C-alpha cells in the first residue's frame, strides 16, 4: 500500500505553512481491507484483478468509442492506472475495466482516488453492476454509480442508483450531484458505503447523498446480491455527448491512484 507523505513547506519566519493534505478517509469503524489495487506494478492492468470489456456497440448509450485491451488505452505507470481515450483517424478508442469474477462483493465500503479528464464530450465513470442478473436484465438487478462526470460540466460530480422502480429510462432514478472544484485538475476521493439498509456516498470524506432501502421489494432494492466494479472512460453518448465533442480534443485521460474495498470484520 502506498505510503503517503504529508508535505509541509514552512516559511523561514515560521509564520506560514502550506500543506498538501490527502482528503480524510471515510472508512467506517469495524471495516477491514479485503481487496485493493494500488497500481504499483508498471505495465498492463493486473490480470488477477481486472478484465477488459471490449467492443464498439454504443454500450446502450450511443457512445462513440471502441473499447480495446491495448496498452495505448489502459496502462499502469508510476503508481497510477491511466485510462486513455484517443482519436485515431476520426475514430475514438478507449478502455473499460471490470472486476467481474475477480472481485465481487455484497455490501462493503468502496473507495477510489481518481482524477477525471477535462474536455467536452468525455464521460468517465466508476460504477457497479451485478455479477449475476438474479432479478433480470438491466435495470431489474440494479446499478450503483459511485461517480459519473460529463465534460461539459467540469466541476460537477454525479452519483445515482438504478433499479426496476427507479431508473433514468422512466425518469425516476435516484440521483444527486455535487460541486467539486478542480475535479479535472487534481485527485479526489470518491467512496460509497453499501449496507443492507442504505447506500451512502462520499466525496473527499464528506457524505453527500444517501439512498435508504424502502424494504418493499427487489424492484426498489435489488442490492442484496454480489456486484463488481467498473472503471471506464466513454466518449460522447446520450449524456456525455449532449453538448457535442470538442473538435480540438485528440486525447483524454482518467487517472486512478488506487481502488480499495473494505468489508465488516
Language-model features: where?
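GH16 jelly-roll
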Residues: 19-265
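Bacterial Sec-dependent N-terminal signal peptides
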Residues: 1-26
Amino acid at each position: 500500500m502506498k505510503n503517503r507523505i504529508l508535505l509541509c513547506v514552512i516559511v523561514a519566519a515560521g509564520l506560514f505553512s502550506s500543506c498538501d493534505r490527502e482528503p480524510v478517509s471515510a472508512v467506517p469503524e469495524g471495516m477491514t481491507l479485503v481487496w485493493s489495487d494500488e497500481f504499483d506494478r508498471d505495465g498492463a492492468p493486473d490480470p488477477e484483478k481486472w478484465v477488459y470489456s471490449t467492443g464498439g456497440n454504443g454500450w446502450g448509450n450511443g457512445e462513440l468509442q471502441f473499447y480495446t485491451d491495448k496498452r495505448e488505452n489502459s496502462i499502469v505507470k508510476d503508481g497510477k492506472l491511466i485510462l486513455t481515450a484517443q482519436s485515431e483517424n476520426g475514430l475514438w478508442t478507449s478502455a473499460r475495466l471490470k472486476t467481474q469474477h475477480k472481485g465481487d462483493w455484497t455490501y462493503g465500503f468502496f473507495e477510489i482516488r481518481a482524477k477525471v479528464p477535462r474536455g467536452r464530450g468525455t464521460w468517465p465513470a466508476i460504477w457497479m453492476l451485478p455479477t449475476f442478473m438474479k432479478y433480470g436484465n438491466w435495470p431489474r438487478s440494479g446499478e450503483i454509480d459511485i461517480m459519473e462526470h460529463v465534460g461539459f460540466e467540469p466541476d460537477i460530480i454525479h452519483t445515482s442508483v438504478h433499479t426496476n422502480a427507479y431508473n433514468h429510462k422512466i425518469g425516476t432514478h435516484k440521483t444527486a450531484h455535487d460541486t467539486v472544484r478542480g475535479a479535472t485538475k487534481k485527485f479526489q476521493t470518491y467512496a460509497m458505503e453499501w449496507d443492507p439498509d442504505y447506500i451512502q456516498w462520499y466525496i473527499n470524506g464528506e457524505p453527500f447523498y444517501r439512498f435508504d432501502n424502502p424494504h418493499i421489494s427487489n424492484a426498489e432494492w435489488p442490492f442484496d446480491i454480489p456486484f463488481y466494479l467498473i472503471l471506464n472512460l466513454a466518449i460522447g453518448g446520450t449524456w456525455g455527448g449532449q453538448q457535442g465533442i470538442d473538435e480540438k480534443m485528440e486525447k483524454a485521460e482518467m487517472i486512478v491512484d488506487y481502488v480499495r474495498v473494505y468489508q465488516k470484520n
